[in-house]
């Protein structure tokens, strides 16, 4: 309470979302202290996870969709895909599988990749059906899986590393209803995953810093250029509204319209 008062009254931070973000490292430190016997559980329990209540109480540290949209063209993605076949590090190859699966599976967020369960996959219908972690919709999103996505899934099915979670990033008894624990786990994995992707991307001489969200944006921009409807794209990305999709990809939508008009004007 004293820290929150400090943020509000001294630092003049009136955004509850902003204050909640500053609480995360404190909670991480407390969690570490308890696990290593530095702080008693009786001290930590009443404090841990007490975020301020906002309109949306699910705190996900996913990158904002409104941040600068960095993406790879289909040609750059194909080059990166071929380059990554030469990567030797086992950990890097696991993370690269997650990255390319995100791209092939219609831009799944990292939180949905790490929480992807085998029960979400219909191998016969080549369909992924899952309630997305960050979306405000409660209905599952159905995502058709192409051959490249299926190839990755078949490979992981043969690995048999986890009876529940596809990419073995969570223990099979993980409680997905524990929003605080899910947030902390995803937040802890985010930096490590993106650090590996950035390193491999840099070694591949790519023009941008590669992150998991680059896979998402690359899928979206490719889909816009291929003529996918904004309604369908919004649904596949799990956006709360079409307006959110239009806002994020406004530049690319305008470019597509302009190019289409130029083509039409060339016709007699």
Where are these regions (language model features)?
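C-terminal catalytic core of Y-nucleophile DNA break-rejoin enzymes
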Residues: 135-155, 163-199
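DNA breakage-rejoining catalytic core of tyrosine-based enzymes
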Residues: 53-82, 137-146, 161-164
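DNA/chromatin major-groove-contacting recognition/catalytic segments
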Residues: 141, 247, 251-268
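Conserved tyrosine-mediated DNA breakage-rejoining catalytic core shared by Y-recombinases
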Residues: 49-50, 54, 115-155
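N-terminal core-binding DNA-recognition domain of tyrosine recombinases/integrases
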Residues: 1-63, 83-86
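Short, polar N-cap/turn motifs at the start of nucleic acid-interacting alpha helices
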Residues: 120-127, 206-208, 228-248
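Short, charged phosphate-coordinating catalytic segments
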Residues: 31-42, 102-125
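Short, basic (Lys/Arg/His-rich) helix/loop patches that form interaction surfaces
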Residues: 87-90, 185, 194-235
């Amino acid at each position: 309470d004293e820290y929150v008062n400090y943020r509000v009254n001294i630092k003049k931070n009136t955004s509850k979302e902003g204050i909640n973000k500053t609480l995360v490292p404190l909670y991480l430190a407390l969690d570490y202290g308890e696990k290593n016997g530095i702080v008693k559980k009786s001290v930590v329990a009443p404090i841990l996870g007490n975020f301020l209540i906002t309109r949306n109480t699910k705190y996900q540290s996913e990158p904002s969709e409104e941040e600068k949209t960095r993406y790879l063209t289909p040609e750059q993605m194909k080059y990166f895909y071929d380059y990554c076949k030469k990567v030797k590090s086992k950990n890097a190859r696991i993370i690269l599988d997650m990255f390319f699966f995100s791209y092939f599976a219609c831009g799944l967020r990292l939180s949905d990749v790490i929480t992807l369960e085998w029960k979400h996959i219909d191998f016969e219908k080549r369909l992924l059906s899952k309630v997305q972690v960050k979306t405000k919709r409660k209905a599952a999103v159905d995502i058709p899986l192409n051959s490249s996505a299926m190839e990755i899934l078949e490979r992981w099915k043969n690995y048999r590393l986890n009876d529940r979670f596809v990419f073995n990033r969570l223990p099979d008894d993980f409680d997905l209803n524990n929003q605080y624990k899910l947030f902390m786990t995803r937040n802890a994995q985010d930096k490590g995953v993106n650090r590996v992707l950035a390193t491999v991307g840099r070694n591949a001489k790519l023009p941008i810093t590669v992150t998991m969200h680059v896979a998402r944006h690359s899928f979206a921009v490719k889909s816009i250029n291929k003529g996918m409807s904004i309604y369908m794209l919004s649904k596949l990305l799990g956006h709360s509204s079409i307006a959110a999709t239009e806002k994020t990809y406004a530049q690319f939508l305008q470019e597509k319209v302009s190019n289409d008009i130029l083509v039409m004007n060339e016709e007699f």
